[in-house]
Amino acid sequence: MSDDQQNGKQNTTTTTSTPTEQDDIEEKLFRHQLTEFYSANGTFLKNSSLESIIMESIGIQSNNNNNNNNDSVNNNSNNNINNSNYNNNNNNIGGNIGTIGSINSINSDMNDIKLGDMLNMGNVLNSGSGLQTRLKRKEILQQPTTPPISTEPTRTYDVFYDKDLDYHKTLRLFNKRLFLHCLRQKALSLKDSIQNSEESDTSSHSSIQSNDHRPLKKQKITTTIKKVKDSSPTLEESSLISKKKSPSSSSSSSSLINSPTTSKETSPVKDTKPTINPKSLFGLSSTIPLIPRVKTEKEKEKEKEIEKEKEKEKEKEKEKEKEKEKEIEKEREKEKEREREREREREREREREREREREREREKEKEKEREREREREREREREREKEFEKERREREKEREREKLNITKDKEKQVIRETTIDETLNKETPHKPTPHITTKKSPNLTPPISSTASPPSVTTYSSLIPSIPTPQSAAATTTTPSSATLTAVSATIPTPTLTPTLSSPTSTSPTTATTLASNNSTITSTTNVNNNNNNNNNNNNNNNNNNNNNNNNNNKFSTPDDFKSLNWIPFLKEDNQQVSEKELLERRMDINQSKQLLLQVINSLNQERTIIEKKLLSDFKNSNTNSSKQ
């Protein structure tokens, strides 16, 4: 059968793999090739016809490597095809050798051939081109970018392994081209030596034919399926040779070449027997030419049937492949649809996210607006607090002014009292205690005696104000005004004092003086006639006045007590004047009334401050509640 028919059985699928996996695959394939070549084909290296077969394999490998060097997927499949082609060539070596002619020279040294005498990797590595390539590779690998190598190089039967080359990719630089180049050179040299030895070596064939009857080695083809990450299997064919173990060959091969790598899944295929007649290799004389066996009609029909079956199988495989491709296409369409659906979902999600973002922006704007409103409210609150503070300060200043006025009034009152005391001490002669007469008329005037009196006494008696009693209809309960007191204090220091009494009917000082003079004349005439009666009643009046004064001293405890106070004027009649004791009592009453008034004012001020604080706190609470709402 042809090589294309044998290759038709292989069903390879291209898959993507990483560079490290690609390197491992190529290294394993090359090791299998070395193992098969040295174990099965080492004895035929002396035959010159091997060069054409090897060159054919070289051409396939070089073309595939040059065309598919940059594509890792195609490179993987091409390596598998190259391996199968190489194995097919090995299977048909016997049939091809049958057409060459005599093989006496091949069988002559069969028992003496060892792997150590054949071409080895030491010769390849020690050659000029190989050594230069290795050194260049080492220079590249020993740059600072690569990690240091800690392993020491080891040598076994002049063969370097990949660990001796400091990097697992180094073997790829010469494992195919250099090895096959050296193999060609060795084959050419062996061809010349075989042609020279064929003429002299004619008697050794009979001895080899009688002694060596080894059957041809069966080749067991195993298919290993390696699963990659994307769960697409890659077919990797390697021919593993099962041969009889001889002491020499087994020891040398085990030390020279590593054992083949094991795969995860192995599915054995039926053994294929080579179409070669063992007698054509080992039992024929050198003088008889080797004639190929002619196939019968039955065998040809069987082969045709087999080819038809294979074609049917191929068609079935193609249909299966088409179905698989359709399924794969459907899966791809479904995956694309799912991807589009996911993209739409992502777009909707992005739209929702943008909507949420806009909502957050609106919330932020609202929050900023609320914050600005709160800030304005706080500003208004600060303004109100400032206004309240101003009002409070104004009230404080007003109270301070009132206190100052009160203190000034007190000082003035003290000054007036002191001046009155001084004038009394200076002007009043030492006489007995006078009798005081009280008048209940609303407009009482001081009486003037008929006899001449000193001007000072007349002036002082005219200074005492006439205050109406509560019994009169037009009378009102009042205290002496500050204006009256100031008038009194202003008129005291003058040498000649004139009476300036303030009455409800008086409009000017002149009218007041005229009224006072007329009243004095009238009262003087009446007093002249009633002088004796008044003298008799003076003692009683004095006693009554003393009792009234004693009662009035204990009377002023509350502001309501001022209503019952009777402001009785102290008048002078007929050389009688007000006693100093009575004047002091009257001053004490006035001072007590002032103190009571000050207490009432202070209490009112305290109540006002409490009310203001309460109102301010209520206002603040109402503002805080409104801002929270």
Curated annotation (Swiss-Prot):
The Low complexity compositionally biased stretches are 247-264, 434-464, 493-554
What GO cellular component term, any one, is given?
NuA4 histone acetyltransferase complex
Basic and acidic residues composition-biased segments: 294-430
Q: Which GO terms describe its molecular function?
A: histone binding
Q: Using the UniProt annotation, give all residue ranges assigned to the region (Disordered).
A: 1-24, 62-87, 197-464, 493-560
Write out the biased-composition intervals (Polar residues): 1-11, 274-288
Its BP terms in the Gene Ontology are:
chromatin remodeling; regulation of transcription by RNA polymerase II
What's the name of the protein? Putative uncharacterized protein DDB_G0271982
Q: Which organism is it from?
A: Dictyostelium discoideum (Social amoeba)
